[in-house]
Amino acid sequence: MKFSLARTTQAAENLLRAVGPGFSPDANDAQSGGALDPEVCFFRTNRLFRRFRPSLAAATVAFLLLLPSAAQTTTYTPPTPEPVAPAAQQKPPGGKVIFSRSTDENGQTTTQTSPQAGPAAAPPAVQMANAPTAEDAERQAVTFTDFDLDVRLRTAEQHIAVRALLTVRNDGNTPLAHIPLQISSSLNWERIRVNVKDVAFPVATLNSDADHTGQLHEAAVLLAQPLAPGASLQLDVTYSGSIAPSAQRLLAIGTPEDVALHSDWDRIGVDFTGLRGFGNVVWYPVSSVPVILGDGARLFDEIGEHKLRLAGARFRLRLTVEFPHGHAPSVALINGHLAPLTVTDAGGLDEEVAGVATAGDGGETLGFEAPSLFVAIRTPRTGANTMIWVLPDDEAAVQDWTAAAATVTPFLQGWLGQRPRSQLTLLDLPDAQDAPYETGSMLATAIRPAGAEQLEGILAHALTHAWMESPRAWLSEGVAHFMGTLWIEKQRGREQALGTLEAARSALALAEPESPGQGVGQPLADAISPVYYRTKATYVLWMLRDVAGDPTLSAALRAYDPAADVSLGYSRDTGPSSFEKLLEQAGTRRDLSWFFADWVNADKGLPDLSIASVFPSPATAGEWLVTVNVANNGYASAEVPVTVRSGSNSVTQRVQVPARGKAAQRLLILGKPFEVQVNDGTIPETQASVHVTRLDQAAGDSPAATQP
C-alpha cells in the first residue's frame, strides 16, 4: 500500500506528539523484597581485560528488518549457548556465581552455569512458533508489578544483555495458562524460569509499531498451573541482542529516511546510548496488544495504556557498561534520574582493552512513564536549578540555556515555591535535528543556540517538572503546560495565552464523547491520551485558577506531595484526590467536589454553552440592571464568566451552569449596556469558547440577542 508524503509526515508528527516531549508551542519549535540476590547475579568473565571482538549483531538486525512485514508471525533461532571455561586467574567479586556470561572469539554471547550451583542443566530449546500462542485478552490481563533488572551493555558492539526478575499479576477475569512476554525484535529470548525451573516458551514475531523495528518477539511462557485472577507470579528471564538505529516502522509507511531516523534515534553506542522504552524501543519485557501506525490513534492509546498499567510498579536496575579504552561514559540516567557512575578504565594498556562502568538506581516506584535508560559521554555544566550535559561542539550554546533558566526561575518560584524537588537535567542529543524527549525532570534535546524567547518558553515547561514531578499524568504534564501558558500570559499578554489554549481545543472537542451514553471517555485521573492529560488538564487548571483564585491554586501546588499522592493508590474508588483536598484546605474551604466529579474523576465531555436571552433595564442614577440567561446543552457543568459592557465600563461575574440546564445572572453596570459575553476562552466547549451578544441600540426595541 502506498502512502502520500503528507500522510506519512503526519504519522511521524503524531508519533512525536505521543512519545515526545509534549512541550509548549515554543518548545516544539526549537520489592523492597525479592531483589536479585548477589549469589544469583550476572558475572562476566575477564570483563576488564577481554578484547573486543567483531559482532554479528548488525547482520542479525538487518536480517530481522528484511522479514516480510505483511506476515503476522515469523520465527527465529536464538544464539546457541556454549560452555566456556572460566579464567583461572580471576575470582568473582564476592558471592557464589551460578550464572556467567562472556563473549567467544567470534563475538557471540555464551553462558555457563557454575558447578557450585548444582548439576548443570541446559535450558530447553526455544520452540519456534508459526503463529502467536497468546490472545489479546491474555496480553491485556498481564500487569507488571515489579522489575528487577541486571543490564549489561557492550557499547562498541551495540549489545545489551539482561537478566530480570519480573513479578506479574493476572488482572483478567479468567486463569492464564501462559504468560505472554514481549521484547524488541532485535533482541532474543534465551532462558525463562518459574519457581527456579526452566520452562518452555514458544516464540513468535508480532508486527507492532510499539518498537522502532516494527516488530516484537513474543514468548508465551507455559505454566504448570494456570495463574488465577488476582494472583501473582515471579519469572526469571534472560535475553540479549543488539540495538542499532532503526526507523523501520516509519520507513514502512513511506516516511523520508532522514525524518524517520531523527524521530527514531534510539540506539546503543560508545558516545551515546538512548533507550526510551515502549513506544520507541522495547528494551524491557512488556505485554501489549500489537498495533501499527496508521490505525487511527490505537498505537498512541496503547502507549498510554502501557504507562498507566505500569504506574505503581517497583523498578530496580543495576547497570554495567563495557566501553573501549579511553571512552568512559560520564553520565547515566535511569528513568530520567541521574545514576552515579563508578568507572574502571585500564589506563596504559592496549587500546582494545575494555573498561567498565557501573551504576544503579536503588529502586523506585514508577509513575505514568515508560522506563528509559541513557548513557553518554558529555561534559556537565550547571545553571539555575539545571544540570546540562553537553557535547564539546555545543559548549557555546550553554550560556543561552542557563540565562533562560535564570530568567524563568523567579516566575516558577512565585507559583510553585522557592526550592524545586530536584534539578532539571538537560542531555544534549547527538544531532541537532533529533526529536526532543522528556521524562520526569529530564529533557533530552539538542543544546543549540536559540533566541531567549524560545528557550524561556521551553524551560518554563521543562523546569516545572523539577518542582512538580507527579506520578499522575494530568498533574505532571498538565501543570507543566499550565505554567507554560502562564509564562506566555506574563510575557505577551492574556489574549496570546488564551489563543494558545484555543489552538488545541478543537482536537480535544473531537476526542471527547458527545454524551456519556457514547462511552466513558477518559477521566483525567486515568487518562492515557496526550489530548486529555495535556490539553484538557491545562484547561482544568485555568478553570481552577478562576474558581479558587491564584493564591489558593499556588498554595495547593506548593503543598502537593507526590509520595502522599501515591499512597492513595491509583484506583478511582479511593475518594477525593490529594490535590482536591489541598485546594479545599488552602482557600476558603469551598466545596469543589462538583468540579472534580465532572472534570477530573469522570469524563462527561465538554459543556455546550449559549446565551439564551438578555434583559437589560434601567435602574437608578444612570445604572442598568442586566439579566443574562445562560444555557448549557452539554453534560459537564461549568462555572462561567459573564461580562456586560457599556460605553465606559465593564462588569464580570461568575455563574455556575449545571449540565443540561440553565442559570441566570444579574449584573449592575454604569451606563447603557451594549454587549454581553459568556466565557472568555478559559472553559473548553464543543463548538466555541467565547459567546457575544450585542444589544439593540434603538430606544424601545425589544432586548433581542444575536450571536456574531
What residue spans do the PLM features occupy?
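Juxtacatalytic substrate-recognition/specificity segment
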Residues: 378-475, 479, 483, 487, ...
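Beta-strand-rich binding/interaction modules
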Residues: 191-193, 328-331, 616-679
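Acidic/His/Gly-enriched intrinsically disordered linker/tail segments
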Residues: 474-550, 562-571
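Amphipathic alpha-helical substructures
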Residues: 420-421, 530-621
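A surface-exposed beta-strand-loop module
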Residues: 98, 107, 187-264, 303-309, ...
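Extended, low-hydrophobicity, Ser/Thr/Pro/Gly-biased non-transmembrane segments
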Residues: 236-371
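N-terminal, polar/Ser/Thr-rich
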Residues: 72-161, 593-597
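Solvent-exposed beta-hairpin/edge-strand motifs
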Residues: 176-205, 322-324, 647-652
